[in-house]
């Protein structure tokens, strides 16, 4: 989840009184808003482990999937949120990432790598921001050290195993401290770890069990039982227990055992109502619901939310097993539809599948397989309520589909108000999914229902056809052959998704332009009897084709006909590869300036801020107003 974020325009001199006041008034009442999910392999239909996270920030915020190449020894990681610096003493590993647009980070291109897999098969989702309590903050405050801007880049660039990633991050916190408190999931083909930065210099990491699930919407004090002496399953800072005991602030469970979560986490009365709303929605989705009135109370004083009567567990047993890939993808789009009083569609409550989602990642881990092929990254670059997750063998990929807009695309379309008449930049799955989602959130009754049904049909076909691709991947024994297939499959999955979604978006625009809303919109490619696609995608066929294929010439897609008439819409052309952007040589030793990127010589960079500090911002806002707005403003991302 996002935290600190410098906005260039707001950092300049002369921010006015009116703007400063408006900024403060617009701040959310619940600043933290990301959701992390874990499902152990004993609970899934395919026997695989799943974990992932939804990042929330704003309604229209551009994200980019890409590949960071390896670098020679001497490469330096740095941050745009703190003074953190770390220089590698070895050749770094290639890894996939999901990053921000450089225009939002002082033109740095490495902003917040967030989620990916490296060439060793280590995956990471970072971060879920949490909060420490005031007692801990007084004795071990945050530092100018490591933070979420750099976590994923360092873990994926440096670690050959998940445990190695945990140990590296822990050692860096020991040395430099942290500038934010976060949870991170780090995994490989054998282990999945939950890492938590608890305070300025204290941390813990727990190897996750195969028979539990977890939903965490930024709550740092969810209960868990851990044996600090079990080094096989728990790693931690040296003074995790002795420091709070020496300071007289340690907390203990009923049986007298040192309680990490209650010692370090925020107090129950300090946790946000929107956080508990999402926790309740998540527990309901996974069929282990909390009971209204007994476990929680709905609060509505102008903002609908929930409060709980006592601290809840970090891990729980779902009410069923056999969870499917589709169900776990859709968990991130959950809007509390089955929770009376906390249904985002009816009651206006915050939701896991909020309109503020910017990116969702889900990692599917096949325990014991070769690290190169063990993990599949399911990636959504827009809001989960109306989006599609694309399967990617990211550990092997060395190139990225041109339908994923790279960081050279304009950020301007994010601010577009009339997306019916003003189309997104050409051949951009990022913007197409953003625009589909915006139209559905604005028109849930006329567009949302059938579009969701269509996207579900598309998602199911991607899942089913990926099984065929996966069989071929597992049959391939060489890294060279696997890499070629991973690149080809990534291109095929992305292109098929783009073409279906672009045609859908064009039909949605035509429906809106026609202005006849007597009948809800129905996509021409949706079979309303089977809720499947009329014309299947060709993902598996394209990925496994042996004959060379000549790509279409790029160009603007044809406009489809009347969406009321069944038929197959025209497909857009294949885009050109993005033009190269001058960059520094691969031997560069800092990420603060340009460096090579496999989509053209793209530069790279940066990350975030402490999400607990709404009150602090309000105080700072008074200073902004009284000083006429001359301040370095830092915008929150959640």
Please place each PLM-identified region on the residue numbering.
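Long, well-ordered mid-to-C-terminal structural blocks that present hydrophobic/aromatic surfaces
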Residues: 299-409
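C-terminal low-complexity, Ser/Thr- and acidic/Pro-rich disordered "stalk" regions positioned immediately N-terminal
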Residues: 540-609
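Charged low-complexity "KEKE/polyampholyte" interaction tracts
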Residues: 381-388, 392-545
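Juxtamembrane/start-of-transmembrane alpha-helix segments at the extracytoplasmic/lumenal side
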Residues: 606-619
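C-terminal membrane-anchoring or membrane-association module
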Residues: 621-638
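C-terminal segment of classical bacterial N-terminal signal peptides
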Residues: 21-31
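A contiguous strand-loop segment
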Residues: 34-148, 168-305
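Bacterial N-terminal signal peptides that target proteins for export
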Residues: 2-17
């Amino acid at each position: 989840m996002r935290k600190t974020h410098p906005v260039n325009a707001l950092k300049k001199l002369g921010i006015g009184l009116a703007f400063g006041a408006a900024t403060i008034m617009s701040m959310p009442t619940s600043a933290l808003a990301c959701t992390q999910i874990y499902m152990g392999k004993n609970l899934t239909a395919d026997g695989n482990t799943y974990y992932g996270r939804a990042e929330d920030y704003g309604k229209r915020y551009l994200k980019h999937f890409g590949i960071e190449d390896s670098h020679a020894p001497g490469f330096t990681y740095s941050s745009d949120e703190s003074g953190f610096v770390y220089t590698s003493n070895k050749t770094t590993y290639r890894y996939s990432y999901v990053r921000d647009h450089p225009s939002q980070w002082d033109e740095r291109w490495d902003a917040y790598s967030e989620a990916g897999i490296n060439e060793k098969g280590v995956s990471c989702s970072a971060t879920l921001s949490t909060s420490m309590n005031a007692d801990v903050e007084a004795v071990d405050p945050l530092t100018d050290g490591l933070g979420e801007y750099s976590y994923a880049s360092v873990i994926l660039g440096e670690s050959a195993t998940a445990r190695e990633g945990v140990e590296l991050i822990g050692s860096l916190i020991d040395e430099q401290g942290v500038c934010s408190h976060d949870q991170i999931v780090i995994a490989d083909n054998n282990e999945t770890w939950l890492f938590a930065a608890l305070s300025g210099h204290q941390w813990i990491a727990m190897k996750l069990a195969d028979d539990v699930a977890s939903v965490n919407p930024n709550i740092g004090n969810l209960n868990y039982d851990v044996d600090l002496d079990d080094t096989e399953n728990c790693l931690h800072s040296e003074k995790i227990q002795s420091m709070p005991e020496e300071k007289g602030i340690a907390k203990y469970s009923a049986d007298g055992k040192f309680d990490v979560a209650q010692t370090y986490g925020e107090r129950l009365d300090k946790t946000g109502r929107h956080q508990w709303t999402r926790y309740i929605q998540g527990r309901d989705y996974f069929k282990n619901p909390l009971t209204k009135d007994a476990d929680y109370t709905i609060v509505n004083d102008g903002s609908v939310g929930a409060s709980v009567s006592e601290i809840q567990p970090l891990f729980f047993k779902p009410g069923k097993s056999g969870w499917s890939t589709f169900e776990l993808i859709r968990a991130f789009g959950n809007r509390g539809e089955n929770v009376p009083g906390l249904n985002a569609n009816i009651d206006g409550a915050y939701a896991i599948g909020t309109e503020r989602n910017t990116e969702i990642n889900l990692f599917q881990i096949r325990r014991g397989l070769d690290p190169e092929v063990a993990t599949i990254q399911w990636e959504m670059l827009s809001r989960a309520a109306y989006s599609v997750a694309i399967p990617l063998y990211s550990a092997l990929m060395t190139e990225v589909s041109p339908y994923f807009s790279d960081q050279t695309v304009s950020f301007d379309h994010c601010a577009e108000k009339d997306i019916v008449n003003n189309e997104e930049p050409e051949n951009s799955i990022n913007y197409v999914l953003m625009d589909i989602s915006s139209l559905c959130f604005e028109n849930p009754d006329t567009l949302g229902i059938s579009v969701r049904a269509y996207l579900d049909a598309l998602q199911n076909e991607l899942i089913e056809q990926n099984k065929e691709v996966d069989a071929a991947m597992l049959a391939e024994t060489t890294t060279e052959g696997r890499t070629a297939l991973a690149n080809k499959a990534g291109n095929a999955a992305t292109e098929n998704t783009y073409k279906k979604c672009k045609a859908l978006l064009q039909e949605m625009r035509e429906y809106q332009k026609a202005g006849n809303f007597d009948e809800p919109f129905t996509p021409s490619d949706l079979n309303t009897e089977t809720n499947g696609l009329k014309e299947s995608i060709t993902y598996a066929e394209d990925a496994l084709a042996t004959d060379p294929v000549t790509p279409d010439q790029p160009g603007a897609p044809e406009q489809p006909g009347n969406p009321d008439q069944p038929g197959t819409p025209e497909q857009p052309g294949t885009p050109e590869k993005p033009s190269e952007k001058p960059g520094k040589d691969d031997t560069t030793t800092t990420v603060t300036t340009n460096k090579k990127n496999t989509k053209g010589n793209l530069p790279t960079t940066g990350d975030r801020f402490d999400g607990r500090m709404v009150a602090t911002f309000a105080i700072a806002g008074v200073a902004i107003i009284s000083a006429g707005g001359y301040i370095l403003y830092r915008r929150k991302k959640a």
